């Protein structure tokens, strides 16, 4: 079997986004009610604004129409990843070292499926967090989601 739709979409749109001096953070293709949504999350140092999102929306729409990787109709949304930005790439784990992070696992690990702590980094293939002077290494292979979080 070939590439998934998301892999195709990412391969098509990543160069367009990078050319604008932006980072492709994440892509989601989800059905909500009767409608499909293609959500593209972009970022840059200092954050993105509405003009960045509008510009990327137009550019991405053109390139997706040309390559047409998605058969059915969908709504395109381009936005910032927000305060709870997902951490997916190795670079994310380096860039956000010291930040408060929430990690959800696919299975119970050491009695839990949810972990919150300050990101120490990606060490070998473990996401290492520190909370109340205790370190926890969570195997990346069992991680479902990792994202920045914030304290109230």
UniProtKB/Swiss-Prot annotation:
Keyword annotations from UniProtKB, A to Z: Cytoplasm, Ribosome biogenesis
Major localization class: cytoplasm
Subcellular location(s) per record: Cytoplasm
PANTHER family: RIBOSOME MATURATION FACTOR RIMP
Function recorded in the entry: Required for maturation of 30S ribosomal subunits.
HAMAP family in UniProt: RimP
Family stated for the protein in its record: Belongs to the RimP family.
Protein name per UniProt: Ribosome maturation factor RimP
